[in-house]
Amino acid sequence: MKFAYRFSNLLGTVYRRGNLNFTCDGNSVISPVGNRVTVFDLKNNKSDTLPLATRYNVKCVGLSPDGRLAIIVDEGGDALLVSLVCRSVLHHFHFKGSVHSVSFSPDGRKFVVTKGNIAQMYHAPGKKREFNAFVLDKTYFGPYDETTCIDWTDDSRCFVVGSKDMSTWVFGAERWDNLIYYALGGHKDAIVACFFESNSLDLYSLSQDGVLCMWQCDTPPEGLRLKPPAGWKADLLQREQEEEEEEGDRETTIRGKATPAEEEKTGKVKYSRLAKYFFNKEGDFNNLTAAAFHKKSHLLVTGFASGIFHLHELPEFNLIHSLSISDQSIASVAINSSGDWIAFGCSGLGQLLVWEWQSESYVLKQQGHFNSMVALAYSPDGQYIVTGGDDGKVKVWNTLSGFCFVTFTEHSSGVTGVTFTATGYVVVTSSMDGTVRAFDLHRYRNFRTFTSPRPTQFSCVAVDASGEIVSAGAQDSFEIFVWSMQTGRLLDVLSGHEGPISGLCFNPMKSILASASWDKTERLWDMFDSWRTKETLALTSDALAVTFRPDGAELAVATLNSQITFWDPENAVQTGSIEGRHHLKTGRKELDKITAKHAAKGKAFTTLCYSADGQSILAGGMSKFVCIYHVREQILMKRFEISCNLSLDAMEEFLNRRKMTEFGNLALIDQDAGQEDGVAIPLPGVRKGDMSSRHFKPEIRVTSLRFSPTGRCWAATTTEGLLIFSLDTRVLFDPFELDTSITPGRVREALRQQDFTRAILMALRLNESKLVQEALEAVPSGEIEVVTSSLPELYVEKVLEFLASSFEVSRHLEFYLLWTHRLLMLHGQKLKSRAGTLLPVIQFLQKSIQRHLDDLSKLCSWNRYNMQYALAVSKQRGTKRSLDPLGSEEEAEASEDDSLHLLGGGGRDSEEGMLAES
């Protein structure tokens, strides 16, 4: 159970590329993030990443009208049919080409994909089990260039497709007699979006140069006639239909022409252009990049390359308002079902914004790190994660909601290290700009800035257990600087290393600082002995990372030769080592001239972290794998693959030999480069950053790893973002001291006999959460103390761990608080003797209770202030203010408190009762 971690959420990245979608209720946004999809619940303020991944970056997402199914298509043309209800993959399909967009029909029976210069219509998967969920119905030809956008009529009879050849094509979903296809021109640039009017065949088309054309149809939707068969064609058609019913997979091809024949024009549907509007006025050349149209309110939203968006009312083209929301191009726009919220995605900076246009306020405003993340740290209670990136920003994330609630931008260069103090309210960061800064999470400000006498670049930072001493290692001067948190003064400069400082770590229990350097040494510094070198540990290679065990009795060091060595800091003796070269499994980059096997000799672990109990260690580095080792046995317990995204570099061990030519690798030729801003050439020798090009494949790597203090999850900063892996107790069956006589039936039989202690013990041995919940909730509140006193000490820890996990999902707050209080009061002394092993469980319990305390305290304070205000207003109603005050302010406050207690009906006891009821 300890190693059964699974991917649970993706933080740090909110949008990459692709189209945004609102769910049917309009309260959630579905955003593609790399090769994953994240759902942002705007009503409950929570984000959740689906537990699935595509082989390449997601390019487009199509949502069914009922909101239960989604089709996710990646850059390689592979599609996943996903159930949003059970969050699982139902079907895999390959479209054999790059797909630009996908759209379901309003009735949910069919969907259309634009692939190359054609549009293909498929039968949507039904509710019954099918061998092939995607059955091709028709293929539509006509455009000469790539098709870009799709829109359906409300009755699902027709759909319109826009193309890069500046034409718009209207196709019939059925065999209509008066409408097979219709080509519309009128534009001088590629079509970005096209939309039908509500319950009409009238449509709007928008091009990239900022031109809107309004087209009127002379036929209503009810005027479409099915094409009747005649003569021998009817017999042939009937025979073909019978064959289609037998085979079930035959498709129809419809080929359109830009200039139809004269006999095809008679009695057909005709379009005429009513108006033509221009967004760019007076020579303002601003490319239109995205658009969305709400049919019920006739609201048109357009996004431009400069980060500006316009709101217009159609068909009058009245400008409602215009606003600049970003410095980068707007890549995607979506409107929810009610038409109140508008979602914008900016792929340049990775921004996701939800704007309420009527109140002109933000519902959601999130942005990830522009460049890769470098460091992360958990708060002591495990509720928050702080990350630092190469863009110089420091972000604090809430692990429960998945949102970033504060961003610090004081650093002017890349952040190299972040850490929390023991209180959890101060974040200390180091940067390449030569400063170490301390941030206050109460007031969200930078209250301390530590600098060195001479400008230097800091590569790492550490804070002692008391939070009074701050130390940072220099990359260029090979020195360690020590400051006081209270005064901000420089206390000492520690010299002795002959290479850049790669890592610092304080002993959690003693005043000892460990420093790792590229000079193949590890030094221990004594804080109370004038910062003298206590020990110098000689290593076999350059040190890259260092960490202490939570109890401070062991030290782990990662070196450049892919080894992890363990040391006893008291006696300066090596206690063990792990050879991790074969566990990294590095891949071959597309620019590598050597194989992955030879390239692995230069790869190593760059980050280490002990688990909460200290029995295992987490290691990651220049690879797509994260390894968990057992410290005592020195063996690999499990290896986690952090990504399967082939859009990243160094993912595969062998390159495709068919792409290897005498001029180099054909995969390096970017097909999408040069479409908007021309061909961008990467700078030579650049290993990280934006590479001077927006079209490059970043290399997969793990830059930082941290275990949660609760021991239930661990986080990793990677090229994909901030990944969180946690224990999923709902799927796994992990019994504890199981016997053949213990069954769920025996547990329920003991509950019927009111033998609660035996029922709880058997349920804990089965270790099924629902059965344990049933056994605990069957105990009357008056007998909780009797049952807890008869529980063996071994099972108290199991009950506390279950209570901690139940606080997050259960509504029985007072009942579980009674269980927690009785267990800690009756077994507190015995549990204290095993404080080291029980620390993760206690921290997990504290985190869950603290979250409820924060939520309820805000609610109760709000209600209390409202009642005080209502009482004050009721006293002043109908009376004039007198010149002389009736009494002192203290008497007035006391009278208000008395009135409030009378209203509550019993003072503090009643308030506690109200808390328990809520």
UniProtKB/Swiss-Prot annotation:
Feature: compositional bias, Basic and acidic residues: 250-262
Phosphoprotein as UniProt keyword: yes
Annotated segments matching region Disordered: 237-262, 878-918
Domain of life according to the entry: Eukaryota
Any one GO CC term of the record: Pwp2p-containing subcomplex of 90S preribosome
GO annotation, biological process: maturation of SSU-rRNA from tricistronic rRNA transcript (SSU-rRNA, 5.8S rRNA, LSU-rRNA); ribosomal small subunit assembly; ribosomal small subunit biogenesis
Location(s), subcellular: Nucleus, Nucleolus
Bias kind Acidic residues: ranges: 887-897
Family to which the UniProt record says this protein belongs: Belongs to the WD repeat PWP2 family.
Name this protein carries in UniProt: Periodic tryptophan protein 2 homolog
Protein source organism: Pongo abelii (Sumatran orangutan)
Gene: PWP2
